[in-house]
Amino acid sequence: IANTSPSSIWLNLLGGVPLEECVGAGSGVKGTQLSHKYEVLKLSVEKFQNGFPHPSVNDIIRYFGGFEMVGAIGAMLRAAEKKMLVMVDGFIMSACMLAASKMYPAVLDYAVFGHCGDEHAHARMLSLMNARPILNIGMRLGEGTGALCAYPIIESSVRMINEMNNFENANITKYF
């Protein structure tokens, strides 16, 4: 709860997307609550920009991110350093990958995007990273549920590549 707020701000500041296009319902706020959320985030960004007229990526993530988000960025960067794939799932982890990609663009080479969630700015964030999620089923559940749905597809793909017969191994004659 509340991680869509820094994620929205990161999309605004790191992606150049107007804040009003970044702020969504998150865990389900509506109406005046959503308007209030936007106003609070707008004031937060204005206050930040007054103190940091030319912020670095580190300034942005330190000011607006929680320890769990900063930790996720570190894990993504370390995985890329080790040439390991990471499953990026949902709006918040996509925001972490966006931040990581601003520090080290090649981190995107090691990202598999599980799904595009129902948060309206998620698709915009994915497009900034040229990411194509495996699933786009409008979930807003959190807790890695998109990764759980996408993982069997990845596992099946790997098995097909590694275990499926080709024409030569199956002794099939080419007819052309």
Task: List each model region and its residues.
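N-terminal loops that bind phosphate or other acidic moieties
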Residues: 1-176
